Amino acid sequence: MKQVPILVLDFGSQYTQLIARKLRESGVYTEVVPYRESIEDIKARKPQGIILSGGPASVYAEDAYKPDEGIWDLGLPILGICYGMQLITQHFGGSVIAADHHEYGKAKLHIENENSPIFKDVAQDSIVWMSHGDRAERLPEGFEVVGTSENSPYAAIANESKHIYAFQFHPEVHHSVEGTHMLKNFAKYICGCESTWNMGSFAKEKIAQIRAQVGEKKVLCGVSGGVDSSVVAAMLHEALPKEQLICVFVDQGLLRKDEAEQVQDMFKLLDIPLITIDAKKEFMEALAGVTDPEQKRKAIGEKFIEVFDKEAGKHTDVSFLAQGTLYTDVIESVSVKGPSKTIKSHHNVGGLPDWMTFELVEPLREIFKDEVRKLGLELGLPKHMIGRHPFPGPGLAIRVMGEVNEEALRLLRESDAIMQEELRSTGYYDKVWQAFTVLLNVQSVGVMGDNRTYDNTVCVRMVESVDGMTATFAHIPHDVLEGISRRIINEIDGINRVVYDISSKPPATIEWE
């Protein structure tokens, strides 16, 4: 098992992944494991420090989440965040109670001990993000207050001699202005970690692992046109001789305008052989008459398996199947369930369908989405392909409200292409996290020239986000939106109205279906 400098024990917080991402961004390799991880497995990773995440439970509840008691005897530095702070307080003899006033949102942190290494070069007063219903009432012996807020007299505590620290706030959330700095201080000055983690070193390590795993056997790699599968293919191409890699691209007719051609051009540029299967007709037949979003997903998934299985059957000498499983998928498949979100086993995690006998190759299962993009650039993939906005697995099918047909896809593709052109020309494409159009199953009356029209409505959706878990609608200048609307209505026959979605997530989701 590889050495992990910082290990995060997950107690169910919606923010847990952010802890690992913030530390990795600063060059410190970090992994997330369930809070119930055994002390043997923790020791096997040889961590230099442990972080206890937040979570939805109460430490004084009968069924409270508790880590393996052995972690307290390792002598390692520990940082507790929110629920993690309450665990530390309780374990060392302090007391925790339900707070009179729940504290949610921004608060001002005042540092009481500027000499504490956790606060090295951190501003004495800064904004932090609180999200808790319980609080420490009495500190354990040996602990001191190192930070306070208006409603939290124990906002940050420390036992400097034991190298144990605890925050009532969430340093990992971007609203905590100095939070990343505090996490880096914990890793660097308290745990002694070095900033050696980067995509260059990861790529070399992973390429060596692929060569050792695959040997001289063949690998089948399904390519969707998305960033993840393209990066997987590029990494396999770097690791293996050309004759050992079989890349298959199923064109299901649900991609954005010219996207299938762009995928094929990219693989030519990278000199990676690509088998393209034109399955548009089969997918359209499978979607005929289907209007329910979940039924669309099911129909697309079943048809993809059928088409891919048929192609896989032609390659009887293949031993491995490559998948674009991400670290997010791995974490969520074993994560603690909490009220913040429903965690389910991801489609890329947990094995293969019964009909497949391949061994899996998953070169991305240790990294996050933003790291995948950095890895793609490291491997030489074109920036315009790596920087594309997220695109759903079922493709345009879930951006057509109602039945999917060729005419609906035409309207959607053309409107989406115009919107993207306008965003790029005005410099807003890279300023939003995701932007797309949705074809609504709504028609309305309009007037074009002297004629009455009764045509389709398109919704423009643009959001700002860090990771897609939460999102706010993008505040795009009206003249940019007006330009998008004018071009869509004037250039696409069949659309006479454009609306802008100003919903945030939550309560809405980013995609409409």
UniProtKB/Swiss-Prot annotation:
Cross-referenced CDD domains: GATase1_GMP_Synthase, GMP_synthase_C
Pathway: Purine metabolism; GMP biosynthesis; GMP from XMP (L-Gln route): step 1/1
One Pfam family from the record: GMP_synt_C
EC number of the protein: 6.3.5.2
Domain Glutamine amidotransferase type-1, chain residue ranges per copy: 5-196
Domain GMPS ATP-PPase residues, every copy: 197-388
Stored InterPro entries: Class_I_gatase-like, GATASE, GMP_synth_C, GMP_synth_GATase, GMP_synthase, GMPS_ATP_PPase_dom, NAD/GMP_synthase, Rossmann-like_a/b/a_fold
Molecular-function annotations in GO: ATP binding; GMP synthase activity
Keyword vocabulary terms for this entry: ATP-binding, Glutamine amidotransferase, GMP biosynthesis, Ligase, Nucleotide-binding, Purine biosynthesis
Broad class of enzyme this protein falls into: ligase
GO cellular component: cytosol
Positions annotated as active site in the UniProt record: C82 (nucleophile), H170, E172
Binding sites annotated in the UniProt record for ATP: S224, G225, G226, V227, D228, S229, S230
Catalytic reactions on record: XMP + L-glutamine + ATP + H2O = GMP + L-glutamate + AMP + diphosphate + 2 H(+)
Subunit structure: Homodimer.
Purpose of the protein: Catalyzes the synthesis of GMP from XMP.
Protein name, as recorded: GMP synthase [glutamine-hydrolyzing]
Organism: Sulfurovum sp. (strain NBC37-1)
Gene giving rise to this polypeptide: guaA
